[in-house]
């Protein structure tokens, strides 16, 4: 169980240094660090908050889902010259991918961590506009969406998904959908650095050297030309949460979804338009889908149509028209 210490926020800041940040895929924080703008990438901290044992209770406030570094006055929820303007990695729906963060040797607070993808593109787009800083309400709405779109440990077959040794059964933190660090006071392989058991300086921090923390996640059945992968680490030792984002592209989700539509007819109803007929698919290839708002075409996603989709019976789909699909 977690011991209670009466300690002021000012004392905490004076005595505890170095923490952690997302490194793979390259987070906005990592890119800021590599550009020489962020002098302490492991220091984007949401504090003081109730981080434990209820790991989802705290509001993200100014930090938002992508983090705010008060040391350098950088808000990563808004794209800058060196981050957020374009994707840094391309995934395919259903991929199993390795993700990694870096914990500082002088700030390994133990606890639990998670990853998420928000599938509300309209909301995510607010974090992709270099001319707009999301409000705190929008930041919290996005974080709620990331929690809803959690990429669970158990989504990856064969991955060990244990309960935190610093959390007791019946506590809110007693869950194994999140990833856990090792016991905070373990004699060896302690805390988050014990997850990989890597060498000191296996990743870069600015305080005392870093240790990698590596896991695997499954990319959801979702397609986006530019979205966000959010990393969140809740500290066990301190009232702190660390939030970071990376900017991926996700391809291929719509192909799977369309196959489900054809086979099961489980999508919406629009009697005017039907898949494979009114849309005029002309064979295998990539088609570009558009959504029209007030007569202006807004790109929605790419559709990878293969032969297994084409000969199926046509079914109606809501919200699309003949002009919404163009062959590239």
From Swiss-Prot:
Membrane-spanning ranges: none
Disulfide topology: 40-43, 66-245, 102-203, 118-145, 153-161, 167-173, 181-192
Any one GO MF annotation of this record: oxidoreductase activity
Catalytic activity: starch + reduced acceptor + O2 = D-glucono-1,5-lactone-terminated malto-oligosaccharides + short-chain malto-oligosaccharides + acceptor + H2O
N-terminal signal peptide: 1-18
An annotated GO cellular component: extracellular region
Phenotype caused by lack of the gene: Impairs degradation of resistant potato starch, but has limited impact on less-resistant wheat starch and no impact on processed solubilized starch.
Keywords carried by this UniProt record: Carbohydrate metabolism, Copper, Disulfide bond, Glycoprotein, Metal-binding, Oxidoreductase, Polysaccharide degradation, Secreted, Signal
Any one GO BP annotation for this protein: polysaccharide catabolic process
Coiled-coil region list: none
Binding site for Cu(2+): 19, 109, 242
Cofactor(s) for this UniProt protein: Cu(2+)
Compartments (UniProt record): Secreted
Biotechnology: Starch-active PMOs provide an expanded perspective on studies of starch metabolism and may have potential in the food and starch-based biofuel industries.
Record's cofactor remark: Binds 1 copper ion per subunit.
EC code: 1.14.99.55
InterPro entries: Cellulose/chitin-bd_N (IPR004302), Starch-active_LPMO (IPR052282)
Function: Lytic polysaccharide monooxygenase involved in breakdown of granular resistant starch.
The name this protein goes by in its record: Lytic polysaccharide monooxygenase aasB
Naturally occurring in which organism (per UniProt): Emericella nidulans (strain FGSC A4 / ATCC 38163 / CBS 112.46 / NRRL 194 / M139) (Aspergillus nidulans)
Record lineage: Eukaryota, Fungi, Dikarya, Ascomycota, Pezizomycotina
Gene name tied to this protein: aasB
